[in-house]
């Protein structure tokens, strides 16, 4: 991503992630804010390039030391660490050797997981292997809008497979090093609906569901790759003996990232997967132009519960971007985000009442941050960041979220 963000035309406004919200230097202040908001868990990612920057496996101890300090401080504050091993930041040296389309990257990821587990496993129980592998594979290798910026179906499918294999190898490494580890994977999922009742749109919705949801759930939950999508992609999966057993190793929980539903129509003008998203009917959209649709979160929680038999779920990301501004009094009023949070927490409460084993909810995000290809224009944080001064200001949504976190209750109902 460092290389990608420094490539002209890849990120809005020419923004890069060089400094972003400078959490690397300001983490004590940021954890202090998390404590003030009453958060009892903190989800963060560990940067593979900080730990093993080169392809030779040499460990950068300074990188590990940062996460060591972060972990100890979280525990001192009574905040449970929830690290993710991979949030899209592949070492450039590994990309130069082929990246996720080649098997070596999955193997190196397993070795990196061993290093991190050995360093932090004595204090951290809860682990996620991958965050939104769909984005790494489909958006990075098929759509070309994220690193490494390819538009190659074969590379995308092979990347998806090796991401799953890397997940399995990481699970193996974590289990070996941390006997009491609670391990999951984080997928961004969306309910997919046909735009009309036509056969073409219904088939498009089936393909969309396969591309967005089933391809990412079925293999890790023991169902194998969905055959309709294997045939649609027409790319041979590079399966070796024993791979599928690794990929489908038992997990302790599933992480669900939810932002919007997808309404689709058929589109066979380009390569697979032959569907195109169309605008939803709701008039309310976020600054990302994403439709606000809380019931979709309830639907996904119940699908994981009823269709897949998942025994423990975390909502690992849910949030919204709006055009926040700092008022003359120095405060940031964002009633739209507050309403968004309450609507989606209500969806969680409904799902729990219907049997969903929801164990926790993480808002995206604590701070405004570098929003990948969108740069710094899109603000998701409960805390406003002035990128020129790095001043943090808790938004009104952050204060409301703190109230909800303290009460575990929303409008008379117990929230997740």
Show where each model-derived region lies.
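N-terminal structural segment of carbohydrate-active enzymes
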Residues: 1-60, 64, 70-73, 77
